[in-house]
């Protein structure tokens, strides 16, 4: 307190008996008495005069910490009659309160550490975690208050990641609305895809849906925690401990829903401007590159052209206008917002979403796992096969819709992408496949459509879900209308192949592939052309009957297009490269290599010095004709285009089963 009194005496002991200005005048009356009074209070270091004055005026509130002095006491109070603040008592009151709070906090910490020392290492870790999470309460404001004492930084370049997180929260909030929950329970869960691939038990499906929403909330809150750790204000640090305590709080708060909706609407408006800023920054970068390139062209006399100066002036004007537009967008978007202000709103949104999930799926037990651990590995999502199986289903649907004009590359890609379990079971299923009566092509497609009509939408949702939010800024193109989607349009994980049973899905795919093989057989039998069955490879037989394509097999009434010149040349080249049965690959390679190497070739410089090379080149045609008599079939170009393509693809043979 000595220091505080010294500061007070230094103010009161003005040199020459002159006091501070009061209404613009110096007070010099009774200088000797005043100096003696001030010197007494300063030298004795005794606050008793102030204390007596306070005791005489007990009716004055102690919180203001100043005495009311009568008009005749001191001359400095005569002019305006306004009470003056006593610095000694004010600072004494504040220091006393802060010292008491500090003593209480230290005693609490010491008691915690004392208990930790007596309970062992494990308990000490828990106590230290509790202590660390309570350190944010050391500030006087306490809680998540908007009137923060620490001035935070602007979000700036981090605004795109913050916008990405806000869109995730908006999507989750939209999926928890009453309309979306009604759509989930009445449309999604009873659908054929969910019932056939996941489960027919509605309670289990509700538990799965609730677990998905909690997982989305965990991801969203994790990003909020990451942004909170970047704040200057320490009360937003380690928010994960605060969110963990929310797990046991399910008290509904009516006002919180309205506040959360208002907050999200406000933040989504910032997200829209941030999305525009994202695109305009890319445009600004292009303008700057064009401007710099024009400057280089103008400085280089060899590449200088007429009108470059005018073009440069136009680019300079556009660049200046674009920079101004970007500055305006930065002011309207999240770029210029304070991170602490946004964090305060995001914390409220996390709290609201936690309560909404509990209200929407209150009947689903969160502690009971949606799937038993022994069978969890049989789900496509946990096995990482959901997207791959979705692509297979999409390819099958494409082949069925274009069964007569599908290129061979797509057919081969389908077979190569089949899982090993389907490939191993495919041969026996095709051999045992029997139909009671011969079905036409439309009838076969109708049978396949019974499965494809509910399986293809699930595969499509899987592909869309995997392509969402893969990188920062994707929300700028697709996520900005998240709050404008109608109910039921948000893709739910339960409506994809993520939770689909692996064995059930493979059984449906195998059935579709077998029907596809039967469809191809019927198409080829009725039209004489079409798809090569994508399942032909595993049932090849060494006993093959080769049928030469001749002009007699062509049906002129079909009106199919003839071969073009390029197709004829390609067909010749493929026919020349046909392998001869009974000749190994090494022998065939040697024959072709000898036929191609000549003395004019760059890699055969010593050919003119070899006597055997000249003899070989002399008898080249005879060797080719004697060793490969059946390798060049008679090509009849008066055939339809599809049959010629089958010859090119080497599918012009009928292979016995």
From Swiss-Prot:
Residues 1-80, 534-559 are annotated as: Disordered. Disruption phenotype: Short roots and hypocotyls due to both a reduced cell number and reduced cell elongation. Plants missing both PSI1 and PSI3 are dwarf and contain reduced starch levels; these phenotypes are partially rescued by sucrose. InterPro entries: DUF3475, DUF668, PSI1/2/3. It is found in: Nucleus. Pfam families: DUF3475, DUF668. It comes from the Eukaryota. Residues 1-15, 26-39, 62-76, 540-556 have a biased composition (Polar residues). GO terms for biological process: positive regulation of growth; regulation of carbohydrate metabolic process; response to peptide hormone. One of its GO terms (cellular component) is nucleus. Keywords: Developmental protein, Lipoprotein, Myristate, Nucleus. A lipid is attached at residue 2 (N-myristoyl glycine). Its main location: nucleus. Promotes seedling growth probably via the regulation of phytosulfokine (PSK) signaling; PSK are peptide phytohormones acting as growth factors. Together with PSI2 and PSI3, required during vegetative growth and reproduction. May also have a function in carbohydrate metabolism. PANTHER family: OS01G0873900 PROTEIN (PTHR31730), PROTEIN PSK SIMULATOR 1 (PTHR31730:SF32). This is Protein PSK SIMULATOR 1. The lineage of its organism: Eukaryota, Viridiplantae, Streptophyta, Embryophyta, Tracheophyta. The gene is PSI1.
